[in-house]
């Protein structure tokens, strides 16, 4: 078992090596668009009739074959996601086959089904990690946001996974439906003793809303910034938050991020360079949030598809205005943000600009208010 303290270092080293060699180190496999929840901001969830109209899910044999080809090309890490991957009755056929290939398999799940026989099978053959999306701090919020009173069940399942020694992380998306629960969610993560990642920027769901760029079930830029600042206040040491505010005020914030942009440059993250996303119906994308460029490994074979995806990703150019912006260190801008907000990779995402301005303003104000309180 890999020590978790060295995992980020190991992953970064492998992806850096993969970039030099043109290898697909990480693959994201979107096993299904189906889900037992009905969250309004989801970027992939489709009803069965929509799936039938658009195509069909890949079979277990097809997923396993693609994984084998990807592994032979260099893939080490694989993430099984959805929709909710556990709604597939053949999930463990796919999962065990990938484990037997020697892949480091992680799982994204809403956590509601991880009990009974499913939990037993995960304990017997543990994944590298399970990432649980936590959508609120109460059953009431879950009913409003997901259509089900699932909070207690999800929390119980997270505790059971942790008790079994399985690495669990919580992913939290803040929307108009659960904004009021942020502190309660943080407290629950602390009680469970699990790492939590929060985001308040929501990509427009262009893959399921008919290409309505810039639209989405999300907070206003100011509200999204408010949630981000509150999260920083909750998680950062006072001196770290103060330094962050100072850097923002000087427009010189530098932070470690997976997605970054340079002036007149292309994609700055791993998407399409050392990582890829397979959709439920067999398309390969650089990132699950992007509608294109798309290639088709079922028809082309994985090697050719990967080479074409890398080449197409290399042609993407982001807004020069974003790359030269002094605020970009505090901004969520990336290729996926640009395309989902504007319909163009080189379009300036005004929502992200407004959110960044508000994040800087509110962070600086919060730091000054805290300083005054400490002096009193």
What are these regions (language model features)?
Residues 1-129:
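Conserved alpha-helical substructure of the radical SAM core
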Residues 4-13, 18, 23, 45, ...:
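Flexible mid-to-C-terminal extensions adjoining Fe-S/redox cofactors in radical SAM and related proteins
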Residues 26, 272-273:
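Short coil/loop residues immediately preceding or within conserved phosphate-binding loops
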Residues 38, 74, 126, 166-167, ...:
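Short loop/turn motifs at secondary-structure junctions
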Residues 48-57, 143-150, 340:
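Short glycine-enriched, charge-decorated loop/helix-capping segments at active-site entrances
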Residues 58, 89, 149, 177-180, ...:
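Residue-level signal for the nucleotide or nucleotide-sugar donor/cofactor binding architecture
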Residues 103, 275-276:
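Generic short beta-strand
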């Amino acid at each position: 078992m890999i020590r978790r303290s060295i995992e980020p270092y190991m992953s970064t080293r492998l992806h850096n090596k993969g970039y030099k060699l043109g290898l697909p180190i990480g693959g994201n496999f979107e096993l299904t668009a189906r889900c037992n929840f009905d969250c309004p901001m989801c970027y992939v969830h489709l009803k069965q009739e929509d799936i039938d109209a658009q195509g069909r899910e890949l079979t277990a044999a097809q997923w396993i074959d693609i994984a084998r080809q990807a592994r032979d090309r260099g893939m080490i890490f694989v993430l099984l996601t959805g929709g909710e991957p556990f709604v597939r009755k053949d999930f463990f056929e796919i999962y065990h086959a990938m484990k037997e290939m020697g892949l480091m398999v992680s799982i994204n799940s809403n956590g509601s089904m991880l009990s009974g026989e499913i939990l037993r099978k995960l304990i017997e053959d543990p994944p590298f990690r399970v990432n649980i999306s936590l959508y609120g701090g109460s059953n009431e919020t879950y009913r409003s946001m997901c259509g089900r009173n699932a909070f207690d069940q999800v929390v119980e399942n997270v505790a059971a996974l942790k008790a079994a020694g399985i690495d669990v992380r919580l992913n939290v998306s803040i929307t108009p439906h659960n904004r009021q629960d942020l502190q309660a969610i943080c407290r629950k993560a602390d009680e469970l003793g699990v790492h939590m990642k929060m985001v308040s920027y929501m990509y427009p769901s262009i893959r399921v809303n008919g290409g309505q760029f810039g639209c989405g079930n999300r907070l206003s830029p100011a509200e999204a910034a408010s949630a981000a600042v509150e999260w920083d206040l909750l998680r950062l040491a006072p001196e770290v938050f103060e330094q962050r505010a100072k850097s923002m005020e000087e427009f010189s914030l530098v932070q470690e991020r997976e997605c970054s942009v340079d002036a007149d440059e292309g994609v700055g993250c791993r998407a399409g360079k050392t990582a890829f996303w397979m959709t439920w119906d067999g398309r390969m994308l650089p990132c699950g949030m992007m509608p294109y460029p798309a290639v088709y490994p079922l028809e082309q074979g994985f090697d050719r598809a990967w080479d074409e995806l890398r080449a197409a990703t290399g042609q993407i150019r982001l807004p020069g205005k974003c790359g030269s912006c002094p605020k970009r260190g505090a901004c969520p801008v990336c290729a996926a943000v640009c395309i989902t907000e504007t319909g163009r990779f080189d379009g300036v995402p005004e929502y992200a600009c407004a959110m960044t301005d508000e994040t800087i303003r509110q962070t600086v104000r919060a730091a000054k208010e805290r300083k005054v309180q400490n002096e009193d």
